[in-house]
Amino acid sequence: MLSPMKTLQKKFNDFKKKIHSKSGIGELYERQIRYIYEKNGWWVKPYGILKGKSDLGRDLLCYKKKQVHIVQAKNWSKYKTIHEKHIMQLAGTILHYIQKNKKNPQGVFITTTKLSPTAKEFVKKLNIKHRYIKLDQNFPMIKCNINRKGKKLFFLPFDKFYDHVHIEKNKGEFYTNSLKECIKKGFRHVGKR
C-alpha cells in the first residue's frame, strides 16, 4: 500500500499525463495563463472556469494596482486561424466592463495559433494586446497558499477549490510541481486532516 504522499504524487502524475477533453485542455491553458499572471504579481479571477458558458467572453480578469486586464485565451491547433469575430467578442466584453465598472481595462488576446490579417488589423485598431503563448502541460500546478488563519495548505489541480485559490508571492505563497517542496516548506494537502 502506498503512503498518503505517494498516493497524492501518483494522482498528480496521472493528472498531468491524462489526455484531457477539449474543454479540459482549455481550462489547463487558462490555468497556465493565470499562473503566468500571478507569478508576475497580478491578482487573477478565473472568470471562464468559474462561470462556464456565462463568462461573457472573459477567461481571466487580472488586477494589479490600478491596471485591469481582460484576457481571452484560445488554445487552438496551430493549423487554425483566429478571425476578427473573436477579437470583436473581446472588444464587446471590454465595452460592457467599462459601462458596468467605470474602469478602462486593457484587452489581452492570448493564443496558441495565428491571427488572420483582418484580426491583426482589428487588434491594432482596438488597442488589444496579442500574445502567442504555447501550451505547456508541465507548468507548475501545485498551489501553496497561506489562508486567513495562517494555515499553510497546498492544492492540486483536481482539488475542489483549486480555482478559487489565489497565489500572492509577497505573502510567501508559490506554485510548484514538487510535493516534496510543499512538505519541506511546511505546507500540507488541503484534503488531509
Residues covered by each model-derived region:
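Generic structural signal for hydrophobic residues
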Residues: 29-33, 119, 178
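Active-site metal-binding core of divalent-cation-utilizing nuclease and nuclease-like domains
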Residues: 40, 44-65
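Acidic-basic catalytic patches of nuclease active cores, encompassing PD-(D/E)XK
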Residues: 2-48
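Catalytic cores of nucleic-acid endonucleases
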Residues: 67-69, 73-133
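Residue-level detector of anion-binding/catalytic polar loops
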Residues: 43, 129, 188
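Structural element of the ATP-grasp superfamily
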Residues: 33-37, 123, 182
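Short, composition-biased local secondary-structure segments
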Residues: 1-10, 76-99, 136-159
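Mature, structured domains enriched in cysteine- and short glycine motifs
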Residues: 132-193
